[in-house]
Amino acid sequence: MKKTILASAAAMCCAVIAQAQTSQQNGASQTITVTAQKRLEDVRQVPLSVTAISGDALQDAHISNFADLASSVPNLSFSAASGAGAGLSTLQIRGISSQAGSATVAVYLDDVSLTTRNLYSQGTAEPRFFDVERVEVLRGPQGTLYGASALGGTLKFISKQPNLRSSEGCALAEVSSTSRGGVNYNLQGVINVPLSQDTLALRVGVQSGKDSGTIDRVDVKTLKVTEHDINDAKWDVLKLGLKAQFNKQWSLTPALFYQRYRSGDIDAAYEAVGDYQSASVGAKLAPFQTSKIVREPGKDVLAVPSATLEGDLGFADLTGVLSGYHRKFDRVQDGTSINSVYIGSVVTDPVLGAKVGFLPSAVQLKNKVNQSAFELRLASKGYEVGKSPLTWIAGVYAARTKTEVFDNEPVFGINAAFKAAGKNIDDPDQLADAFPGAFKNDSSYYSARHYNDRQTSVFGEITYHISNNLRAIVGLRSLRATQHFMREGDFYYAGGPSSVVIDSSASASTPRFALSWDMDKQTSLYLNVAKGFRLGSANRPVPLTTLVKADLKDMGLPQTIPEAYLPDSLWSYEIGSKSRLLGGQLALNVAAFYIDWSNIQQDVVLPNAGFDFETNVGKARSVGFEFDARLRVTDQVTLLGSGSVANATFSSDMPALGSDGNGALNVRKGDRIQGVPRFNASLGIEVGVGNNGFVRASGQWVGASVGSFVRDSSDHVRPGYFTASVAAGMSLAKWEFTAFVKNLSNNQQVIQRPDVQGVSTVYHLRPRTVGATVSTTF
């Protein structure tokens, strides 16, 4: 069952401080280049709202995951499905939030798309922020250049490339300690070696680390701690890049990104013993404790090979990218509350039913994604005064993706329990809805889902330079997609063996129109209008069991599950400015937007049955603005600030999302979209000390948001919160030493209370972390 869990709270807002350090080192007039429009250009020339954070800034700010990034980028938020943890998260930009259907934010590792559908069993792939040149966050729909699922925007990881001219390297060691947890560490090293001067170079990077857990597991009967820090996480990363420069015009760069991430459990605690667990039902637990019956570990492995061919044709630059994206994500959930408890409640013998209700049950999920893609694009040379007023980019894209989800849910010991009681587990008079073979090998449910997707598209943009300081852009992408879906199911909750095959297809066009005006050398204004689009898909079949029917009735929904859900789309209207004022001492970027979203893909959760399905529910709009500013007060003092507002609301009643016990709709016109903080603000300062030292401090406030659309849910309103961090350090020759504190006040506030697999859980801010970093370059 998919649950929406806002998890952006896990991070500190140091990133802007680290950017200040970079600016101080490089000078106030530093030019920031980005590839937002698939060509390298000055960010001021891009008529989009873009945040670019350098690799050095990411390292200085200890940004290593989506949660950390969300804390420092205006109008970027972060949620998770089925519990908080790596591989479960999804991103939202400008209030375009949906845990159903395809992702609303496209994620790219260089030119390789890591974007896949949202599933109850997994979230977006999350590469570590390691050996990157920069990270770019492109706000607003990017469908013209980045295709379907760039509905709210795009996140790009830009890797550092092999250096053909000189050997270089770097190393870093970080150790820290987390309150209520233990020791954390991160070790990494990168080396670049020219194998042949100016023609062939190899770049290798490795990283290994651990974050300590903070949650203790207690015995459900004695309430004594049996395991400490169960939610620890470990990771290993390997990056390889080989660049061959054949001549001045042509080069080939094969690359590989490999990551293995293992977690001992999700970051969920309980406030009280669940009502299914023991005679201690309702007993209060201490903060950061859980009484779960079954541990919930996970293992997420990513492999991203690619080969990029670049050629200078004289009149234009050719880029061809052949890539793969392979992911295997295995995880376990505690299914006792939705499997054992329900089965026990429909056993006619109350003594046996009570025993069955306490049997441990696991939801064993295995996810596989295998994608191959190819993109070929041709980009004209940059604009030069006195030459052609037109610049352009055109390309083709093709991808084939196979996604498989295997779900096995055993109730351990159920056959033995019936046998010991002298009962027949296949008899519907002794167990409601039973049939022969319903619990083979103790499994209560099995499902195998296979999605085979194919997508082709052509795209292009033309920029007409009306004058030296006025530009107009027109772009269009035309997309065609097909899907073959097959699902196999069996055992008790599936109603016996079943098989479903659904074929579907879709097409879309996503235009873009933009106007950019350089008022003077310091300020540029822009207008951008763009369309975003998401593909639809088949729903996983949901058996109409007694519990499913009861949930549908209680929610005021029809007694049927839709076979599929349709595409959705939006139009975005944005105006903004980018300024360098006070002689370059003040950098100020401001943008305002209005988004109209229709036919929204949304998730409908059946709370007691343990199933969910996707459907299209209506319309929404998101209105807001964002800004970021950097002021270099003196050579030694820099101030930074950023903020955003996103008023994302449904613009019509949503009967498809059900009603409460009194018949009132769960979601009505004007209700806020889930998982979107209305306000977000950060403020930071960096002070240089002498020639080699620095002190940084930053703070962030995240506003309240809506968790569950069910009004009487404990997670309906998620409170706002404030966090702060500090760091100090110094440089000696090629060495840098830093001490830091994240969550300075040790704020352990409960920021959400979602229901996960039928259990009410709580999520805390990660406690204070104190650490030190040593790094060097050579």
Report each predicted region and the residues it spans.
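C-terminal beta-signal and adjacent terminal beta-strands/loops
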Residues: 639, 700-710, 729-778
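Gram-negative outer-membrane beta-barrel transporters
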Residues: 379-381, 392-395, 468, 587, ...
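Structural signature of Gram-negative outer-membrane beta-barrels, strongest in the C-terminal barrel
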Residues: 243-247, 378-381, 391-399, 449-595, ...
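N-terminal periplasmic accessory domains that precede
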Residues: 66-69, 90-94, 104, 108-110, ...
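Transmembrane beta-barrel wall of Gram-negative outer-membrane proteins
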Residues: 168-170, 179-266, 370, 374, ...
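Short acidic/polar hinge/loop motifs at secondary-structure boundaries
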Residues: 112-139, 189
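Membrane-embedded beta-barrel scaffold of Gram-negative outer-membrane proteins
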Residues: 188, 306-313, 317-335, 518, ...
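Extracytoplasmic beta-strand/coil segments of soluble accessory domains associated
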Residues: 35, 67, 71-112, 133
